[in-house]
């Protein structure tokens, strides 16, 4: 080995540069804002691709079938379906794990702790849906999109909140995370009940049998994840063919995984830890990349003032913060809950605005709501517009409020 080569200035600075770059890279992916930033990059890339000559090739790629068919087993689907039904099932598996953990030992484990995020989430679901229905209730083509403004993109919302650092109380971040989990739970129920197609009870029976088997494994104390994930994948196949959206399989699988407060190395905790980074840094960015590819047309700006666009934008930008704020205020007023420490009503209003960042979850429900490409694109554009407006308003309100407090 050439010792002089190792000690030379060039070699030293090159090795230091690599080390610094590695530290920057590691620090970025450990930050709470990383998921939101990566999502934003994927959105921009997807929009650029869609509005260049690459858009046609990208759509052809998403439509390319992958998989196989054998002995009556149908597992050959377009890449886009694998993303929206397959990868998103893994996302909902993680959501299910988070919900179960919070109910057993987290912010939702007691009525007093759960009251504020639960009631706030309910308000943040009902008011946006009512606003949307006010504009679209009489239209048979767009009325079914009422679930679109109900959703919150937790990665973006927490990402923006984390950019404020210690300018906002830590309790506000916990409040937003708990609220988003309840929001996701409501979205799951809405998808299962209202966005299912014609039901095939034979496949539902098969899926139900596997769910019972997983519950038996839980009761027997089986801790090997293989005995939950493999049957869970089979349950996904049956649910996909049953008429209920296949992502529900992820939630059902999560509910059967064993956990308890004493065992920090339980199957639920292990799987939740293992899935967090792949979901945040692979699955959600891939979903955004595949589903935000909107080719802009002049008619889209006009669509923002149509019933569909107004229902989504006003539902997210106004309905979300109004619903979250009013229900939070009522829950504190009737002494059912308390605000987190050092949290003011201005903080709650800012949090409500961040809850209006529907983005990936709203797009997901829009794809379930509309089969027509024109409605899908109009809804996506309205969701993007609303998410930018709500996110910017929430960030400006919270940062300026903190600045004013410091000056006082």
Curated annotation (Swiss-Prot):
Single annotated GO MF: sodium:proton antiporter activity
Keywords from the UniProt entry: Antiport, Cell inner membrane, Cell membrane, Ion transport, Membrane, Sodium, Sodium transport, Transmembrane, Transmembrane helix, Transport
Main function: Na(+)/H(+) antiporter that extrudes sodium in exchange for external protons.
Disulfide bonds: none
Catalysed reaction, written as an equation: Na(+)(in) + 2 H(+)(out) = Na(+)(out) + 2 H(+)(in)
Lineage top rank: taxon: Bacteria
Family as reported in the entry's similarity comment: Belongs to the NhaA Na(+)/H(+) (TC 2.A.33) antiporter family.
Designated name of the protein: Na(+)/H(+) antiporter NhaA 2
Organism: Flavobacterium johnsoniae (strain ATCC 17061 / DSM 2064 / JCM 8514 / BCRC 14874 / CCUG 350202 / NBRC 14942 / NCIMB 11054 / UW101)
Transmembrane regions: 36-56, 79-99, 115-135, 145-165, 174-194, 197-217, 225-245, 281-301, 310-330, 348-368, 381-401
Localization: Cell inner membrane
Matches recorded under Pfam families: Na_H_antiport_1 (PF06965)
Major location category of this protein: membrane
Lipid bilayer topology: Multi-pass membrane protein
Any one GO BP annotation for this protein: regulation of pH
Entry GO terms, CC: plasma membrane
